[in-house]
């Protein structure tokens, strides 16, 4: 059991597992923010723009009694689709920004050696020419 716990500790302390855990926590929080944005800001404004529609209450009655109808709540589904599109777009922008930064790092010109190294290289070359 001790070896198992030690192996688990080593797994958790590796960078990838920690990065994944942080990503999941931040992703969950970001998802809640986007859900609130869609439900509380985006769909009400969109509903007003297309004629005062409340997306949360859009549903088809497919059966049941008038007091307790069976419904397909497609308005909730539309909100989930809006959530997904906004989250996917935000992730796209984030990945695009990260790729741009990585490309700039790769394309940066090589740094010049310090003046001391240049001087020592010149001295070495002079000594090599004189020794021949």
UniProtKB/Swiss-Prot annotation:
<keyword id="KW-0997">Cell inner membrane</keyword>
<keyword id="KW-0407">Ion channel</keyword>
<dbReference type="InterPro" id="IPR036019">
    <property type="entry name" value="MscL_channel"/>
</dbReference>
<dbReference type="InterPro" id="IPR037673">
    <property type="entry name" value="MSC/AndL"/>
</dbReference>
<keyword id="KW-1133">Transmembrane helix</keyword>
<dbReference type="Pfam" id="PF01741">
    <property type="entry name" value="MscL"/>
</dbReference>
<keyword id="KW-1003">Cell membrane</keyword>
<dbReference type="GO" id="GO:0005886">
    <property type="term" value="C:plasma membrane"/>
</dbReference>
<keyword id="KW-0813">Transport</keyword>
<keyword id="KW-0472">Membrane</keyword>
<keyword id="KW-0406">Ion transport</keyword>
<feature type="transmembrane region" description="Helical">
    <location>
        <begin position="75"/>
        <end position="95"/>
    </location>
</feature>
<comment type="function">
    <text>Channel that opens in response to stretch forces in the membrane lipid bilayer. May participate in the regulation of osmotic pressure changes within the cell.</text>
</comment>
<dbReference type="GO" id="GO:0008381">
    <property type="term" value="F:mechanosensitive monoatomic ion channel activity"/>
</dbReference>
<protein>
    <recommendedName>
        <fullName>Large-conductance mechanosensitive channel</fullName>
    </recommendedName>
</protein>
<comment type="similarity">
    <text>Belongs to the MscL family.</text>
</comment>
<keyword id="KW-0812">Transmembrane</keyword>
<comment type="subunit">
    <text>Homopentamer.</text>
</comment>
<feature type="transmembrane region" description="Helical">
    <location>
        <begin position="11"/>
        <end position="31"/>
    </location>
</feature>
<dbReference type="InterPro" id="IPR001185">
    <property type="entry name" value="MS_channel"/>
</dbReference>
